[in-house]
């Protein structure tokens, strides 16, 4: 499945850490999920999933509660999901997933970010066909074969199960992510460090130090945009 997940997580953690910007983005995602259904995670599975992910990212409880309270209070903002695809230097590819209350603002900002940082924004589908939408579940463990058997018995469509640095990493079909989580919980595994839908590059490129500096500036600028929730790329040495 490409780069080791442990390496991806280590670089991401070193890059953004538990910052207020991460909290704010989760706040928006929680609010949007609560507005689309009931503001109660026990009756709104989408909201429950976002809250679980927020806790994995160490988002404080007061941030989660504030977003839910805002939805309960009848906040009138409507958020729309989007995806923008583009290219960086020397065969590098980028996908930016957004959640915004102002689509025109987001389109303009993302396009400007690409152009100012050595990239070019592409049409829908220009890049995403080179990535696989994949469910990723990570938790402590050292026996991938046993975990594979658990998931197989539960008829979860699994792409791969690996052991990386004391962690089990499960890759599922995107439609079976929640089924996989449920099967693991039923088997007594309840603590997860990651439960995400991710776009994983089918192949990767390595950039020269000069190109890497340009590309890193592009990724940083996209991640700094308040409307951008996730950024995926195919650069192995970032």
From Swiss-Prot:
Its main location: cytoplasm. Keywords: Cytoplasm, DNA-binding, Transcription, Transcription regulation. Pfam families: TACO1_YebC_N (PF20772), Transcrip_reg (PF01709). The keyword DNA-binding applies. GO terms for biological process: regulation of DNA-templated transcription. It is found in: Cytoplasm. GO terms for cellular component: cytosol. Signal peptide: none annotated. GO terms for molecular function: DNA binding. InterPro entries: Integrase-like_N, TACO1_YebC-like_2nd/3rd_dom, TACO1_YebC_N, Transcrip_reg_TACO1-like, Transcrip_reg_TACO1-like_dom3, Transcrip_reg_TACO1_YeeN, YebC-like. HAMAP family: Transcrip_reg_TACO1 (MF_00693), Transcrip_reg_TACO1_YeeN (MF_00918). Belongs to the TACO1 family. YeeN subfamily. This is Probable transcriptional regulatory protein LACR_0237. It comes from Lactococcus lactis subsp. cremoris (strain SK11).
């Amino acid at each position: 499945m490409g780069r080791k997940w442990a390496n991806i997580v280590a670089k991401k953690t070193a890059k953004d850490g538990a910052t207020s910007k991460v909290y704010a983005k989760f706040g928006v995602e929680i609010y949007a999920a609560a507005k689309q259904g009931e503001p109660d995670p026990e009756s709104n599975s989408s909201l429950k999933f976002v809250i679980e992910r927020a806790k994995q990212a160490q988002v404080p409880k007061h941030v989660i509660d504030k977003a839910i309270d805002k939805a309960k209070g009848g906040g009138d903002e409507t958020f729309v999901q989007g995806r923008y695809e583009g290219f960086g230097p020397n065969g590098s590819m980028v996908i930016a997933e957004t959640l915004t209350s102002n689509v025109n603002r987001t389109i303009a900002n993302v396009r400007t970010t690409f152009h100012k940082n050595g990239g070019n924004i592409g049409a829908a589908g220009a890049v995403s066909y080179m990535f696989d939408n994949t469910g990723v579940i990570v938790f402590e463990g050292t026996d991938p074969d046993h975990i594979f058997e658990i998931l197989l018995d539960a008829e979860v469509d699994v792409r791969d199960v690996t052991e990386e640095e004391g962690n089990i990493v499960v890759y599922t079909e995107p439609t079976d992510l929640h089924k996989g989580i449920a099967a693991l919980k039923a088997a007594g595994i309840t603590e997860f460090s990651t439960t995400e839908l991710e776009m994983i590059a089918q192949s990767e490129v390595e950039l020269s130090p000069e190109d890497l500096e340009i590309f890193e500036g592009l990724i940083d600028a996209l991640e700094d945009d308040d409307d951008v929730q996730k950024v995926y790329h195919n650069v192995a040495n970032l």
